[in-house]
């Protein structure tokens, strides 16, 4: 099998040495680890299709992988030593960038940061943004329907996509690549593959939407009394800023404390602490003065008791420093010790009640555990993370993983929410899907999987 794969992609693109493949075989949290037969890196859609055709004929299972930044184990092989990791890192070309149509067609291995730079090269803006953007890839972003910090204004990855090129399990290449904003010719196959996590086909390229480059961007860090006050502030800023509101991130005091403790070169923007914080970003497309707008809104918010205090970044460096206080929360938690994490969403108006009830349940069941709920309040996506008690044994704390998951996921369901807001299902949440998904929807999903991947070679053991 290895010889036939080498004949397709070249021997240098087939990696078998364990010291090389190990970096592909472990996901970022260390929850899942596998042993692949090999890692293969095709450099074109044609090579990738030939690989899939060969694997399909020989019933060899394939695990597609982009930047290996996924957080639910969707990109990780099992321990059989028989699965192939199909890395898309060499499919990294920009096929077309069109500032007139406001589109760009990129291959799946382009990193998100590179995609943003391609947009900037023609004075356009690609709004998908997240902490892993230097490593995560467009293919992975689309396979998981990634969210990030600007969903409030632009939607998730699905809403930024006009068309796809997808390698199917039997080696055929499906293309819906198009710069058209209107096309009613049949079923929308593009959206079928977005969020399918490589179980229905392997995304090899995508046509993505571009937007006008914002004239200016302003960042504020706001001190708050509670999530309820944060909700009032969100509604107030929405009404005043309209579509200029790009991000509204909720941060508890413990999260800020952990960042200040564990991340070098960070500092508290306020002279005294607050129980909660919000990071706000506005970026009008028109040549309005965003600083004046944000100053006016926050001044009025403080007067009307929607906020306690606020600071607006006075430079690009300070804006970056404020964003770092949000983006390094997960890393700070990791350095603090054990952390049990949840990527959930609930209706925005119910976020304060959810945080309150979740906190009560955690304290009743694990009295010394420390909830750290933070995230994209503007779109209802919370990362409800729980850090270990001070001085606790990490292994003993993490042994409560399943119990804590049951508590948070049940409450999420009670609130009409989702157990996976933006990270996907992968291996981590596969067993939960039958508990939360409509039975008819599950039946349709299984039928689609059987039709598109009859031999079950595409990312088995993931999602469905």
Q: What feature does the model see in each segment?
A:
Residues 1-28, 58-60, 301-317, 414-419, ...:
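N-terminal accessory segments
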Residues 3-14, 57-60, 117-124, 147, ...:
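Generic secondary-structure signature for well-ordered alpha-helical cores
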Residues 16-23, 221-224, 231-398, 404-407, ...:
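C-terminal substrate-recognition/cap domain of FAD-linked oxidoreductases
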Residues 172, 430-464:
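Activity-critical C-terminal alpha-helical subdomain
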């Amino acid at each position: 099998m290895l010889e036939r794969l080498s004949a397709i992609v070249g021997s240098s693109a087939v990696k078998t040495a364990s010291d090389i493949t190990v970096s592909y075989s472990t996901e970022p949290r260390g929850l899942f680890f596998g042993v692949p037969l090999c890692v293969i890196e095709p450099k074109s859609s044609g090579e990738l299709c030939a690989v899939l055709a060969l694997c399909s004929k020989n019933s060899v299972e394939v695990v597609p992988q982009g930047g290996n930044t996924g957080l639910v184990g969707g990109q990780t092989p099992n321990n059989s030593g028989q699965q192939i990791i199909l890395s898309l890192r060499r499919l990294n070309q920009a096929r077309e960038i069109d500032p007139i149509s406001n589109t760009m067609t990129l291959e799946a291995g382009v990193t998100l940061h590179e995609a943003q730079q391609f947009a900037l090269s023609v004075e356009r803006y690609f709004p998908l943004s997240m902490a892993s953007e230097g490593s995560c890839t467009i293919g992975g972003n689309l396979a998981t329907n990634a969210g990030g910090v600007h969903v409030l204004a632009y939607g998730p990855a699905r809403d930024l996509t006009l068309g796809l090129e997808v390698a199917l399990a039997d080696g055929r290449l499906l293309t819906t690549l198009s710069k058209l904003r209107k096309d009613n010719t049949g079923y929308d196959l593009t959206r079928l593959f977005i969020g399918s996590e490589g179980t229905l086909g392997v995304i090899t390229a995508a046509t993505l939407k571009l937007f006008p480059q914002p004239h200016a961007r302003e960042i504020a860090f706001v001190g708050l009394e509670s999530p309820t006050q944060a909700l009032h502030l969100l509604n107030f800023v929405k009404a005043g800023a309209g579509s200029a509101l790009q991000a509204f991130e909720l941060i508890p005091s413990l999260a800020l404390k952990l960042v200040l403790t564990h991340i070098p070169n960070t500092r508290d923007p306020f002279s005294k602490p607050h129980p909660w914080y919000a990071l706000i970003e506005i970026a009008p497309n028109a040549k309005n003065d965003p600083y004046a707008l944000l100053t006016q809104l926050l001044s009025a918010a403080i007067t009307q008791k929607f906020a306690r205090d606020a600071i607006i970044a006075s430079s690009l460096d300070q804006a970056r420093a404020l964003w770092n206080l949000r983006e390094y929360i997960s890393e700070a938690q990791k350095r603090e010790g054990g952390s049990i994490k949840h990527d959930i969403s609930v209706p925005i108006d119910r976020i304060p009640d959810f945080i309150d009830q979740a906190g009560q349940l955690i304290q009743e069941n694990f009295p010394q555990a420390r909830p750290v709920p933070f995230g994209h309040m503007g779109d209802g996506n919370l990362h409800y993370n729980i850090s270990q008690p001070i001085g606790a044994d990490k292994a003993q704390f993490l042994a409560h993983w399943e119990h804590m998951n049951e508590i948070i996921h049940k409450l999420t369901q009670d609130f009409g929410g989702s157990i996976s807001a933006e990270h996907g299902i992968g291996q981590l949440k596969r067993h939960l899907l039958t508990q939360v998904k409509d039975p008819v929807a599950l039946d349709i999903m299984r039928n689609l999987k059987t039709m598109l991947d009859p031999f079950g070679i595409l990312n088995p053991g993931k999602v469905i």
